[in-house]
Amino acid sequence: LEPHGLKFVSGWHSLNLLTHSVEDEKKAIQPHLDLLKAMGCKVCIVCETSNAIHGNDDAALNNSPVLAGDQWAKFGADVELIAAYCADQGIDLVYHHHMGTIVETADEIHAFMDSTGPKTKLLLDTGHAWFGGADPKELATRYMDRVGHIHCKNVRPAISKQVREEGLSFLEGVRRGVFTVPGDAEGGVAFEPVLKIAGEHGYSGWLVIEAEQDPNVRNPFEYQSLGLKSLRDMAEKTGLDKGDI
């Protein structure tokens, strides 16, 4: 990566705390932590996937798994133990709220944040928040002090409506183009309010452009270039970019 001026920021690790013990999950995450530490990464991206449906083409996104109210306390406590385990090795655990998982909606994000402690950080994903019915600005306002990583993903409202009304899977939504980059006129996510709040709270982590799209339909170079330019312009306008990125 270095010859191309690139850095390895982090990587996804699937948690299975609903079906495995904390000790087993510590063992499972350790090789990933070793890689992150070797690469100089600061955050470890995690998400509970034991009952997730985002990778199942036969499952309608409308049928995302739901965690019973009396299960949140234990789940949150277990995540906090894994977060402490990561923190002891110099890595912040950042939890990715994600479509097709138990932490998808605004209420679920709030329940998760309420049931975890200070070691657990939030990966604020603007696209997954919007798609899940949450307001990215409201999440930023409420939780920025615990946000450790930001994914700047846009959503095409017309496609997200199709996913809901036609009972499509998450994967089919992605194939149809539900996600796109910052700056795309077809997108519905307002990024500037989130970036402004991040700047006001002294956020110094990464802003990651994410937008899984069919490369045969939408040119990756063109869209990534649009996303990067738009995000840089917005970061500068809102005061988040101090001129050193």
Provide a role label for each language-model segment.
Residues H20-E25, A134-P136, R218-E222:
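Short, solvent-exposed loop/turn segments at secondary-structure boundaries
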Residues G11, A77-D184, G188, E236-G243:
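Acidic/histidine-rich catalytic cores of soluble enzymes
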Residues W12-E23, G69-W72, V178-A185:
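The substrate-binding groove and active-site-proximal loops of carbohydrate-active enzymes
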Residues L1, L36, L93, D125, ...:
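Conserved, mostly hydrophobic/aromatic
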Residues R218-G243:
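C-terminal helical cap(s) of enzyme catalytic domains, especially alpha/beta-barrels
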Residues L1-G11, K27-C41, E80-D88, F112-G117, ...:
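Acidic (Asp/Glu)-rich catalytic clusters
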Residues T19-L124:
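Active-site acidic/histidine proton-transfer and metal-coordination neighborhood
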Residues V208-E212:
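Short acidic/histidine-rich active-site segments
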